[in-house]
Amino acid sequence: MSRAILQVMIRGRVQGVGYRAWVEYQATASGLEGWVRNRRDGSVEALFAGAPNHVADMVALCRHGPPSSRVDSVTSETAGADELNLRRAGEKFSVLPTV
């Protein structure tokens, strides 16, 4: 089975609205690995790894976000497996500190 790894940037009103917790829930429910974190510029960054169709579906979900968010843009690019090393030990999906 092939595996996709995408790094995603989400911009808009995506901090202070439960966006990271929502991403963690959706990604875990989809069986994805990776992480999500706030960035100091007000965006949210995420890494999703898993079956290509599940990763694509997650990126599509990110375009909508939770009800209290407003997503202005979502961009993604292929990432290397080494990016998964940012996760906390023993976790498949982590909410990381702000960078």
From Swiss-Prot:
The active site is at R20, N38. It is an enzyme of class 3 (hydrolase). Keywords: Hydrolase. GO terms for molecular function: acylphosphatase activity. The keyword Lyase does not apply. Residues 5-97 form the Acylphosphatase-like domain. The keyword Transferase does not apply. Its EC number is 3.6.1.7. InterPro entries: Acylphosphatase (IPR020456), Acylphosphatase-like_dom (IPR001792), Acylphosphatase-like_dom_sf (IPR036046), Acylphosphatase_CS (IPR017968). Belongs to the acylphosphatase family. PANTHER family: ACYLPHOSPHATASE (PTHR47268:SF4). This is Acylphosphatase.
